[in-house]
Every structure is written in structure tokens, then in C-alpha cells.
């Protein structure tokens, strides 16, 4: 899975882990993060969400290959994720290390 998730000390850490594609985010990854936010919203053990990428790059943004081949699928997943992010009732922090471009900037 390209989104790693773990909760420790009240922090839900969502890590973009797709180094071979410069951490570009596809629909499945957006859906995974949306589902994680949905669960975390009602989980009292989660006090904050930390979004992070790899050591060399945060994210190259949306997966351009998927954008060309399945634009409606990626668009739906992105729309759902950013709506969930805007409505999320707890603090969200992006730990940006290295380049962060495209839709990743909106995080």
C-alpha cells in the first residue's frame, strides 16, 4: 500500500510512500486517506493528523498517468479527499520535506 498509517501518542501519521513515482498520489491513495480521515474524525485516540512524504520528496502531486487514463476516477477521489480534509474537525499538519508540487500543495 502506498499510504502508510499508524497512530501513536494521539498522532495519526499518514505517510505517502510511493518513491518510485516521486510520491505521486493516485485515486486509491486519495481514497485511503479519505477513509483514514473519516475514521479519525470520530476516534478519541486521535488528536492530530500528520501528513508526510518521504525523506527526499513530499509529493509530485496527482498521478499524471492516471489523470490521463482515468480522469473521472482520480477527480472523484481527489474531490472527496479535499472535502474530507476541509471538514476535518481536528488539526492537520503537513510535514513537507523536499519538493511539494501540484495538488500536494493543497494539503
State the predicted function of each range:
Residues 1-54, 83:
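Conserved CoA-thioester-binding segment of acyl-CoA-metabolizing enzymes
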Residues 17, 62, 97:
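Histidine-centered beta-alpha loop that forms part of the nucleotide-sugar donor binding/catalytic region
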Residues 24, 59, 103:
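Residues that form or flank phosphate/diphosphate-binding pockets in enzymes
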Residues 28-29, 63-67, 107:
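Short, glycine/charged-enriched secondary-structure capping and boundary segments
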Residues 42-45, 72, 90:
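Generic structural signal for secondary-structure transition and capping sites
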Residues 53-84, 100:
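Glycine- (often His-adjacent) and acidic-residue-rich active-site loop
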Residues 84-107:
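Glycine-rich beta-to-alpha active-site loop
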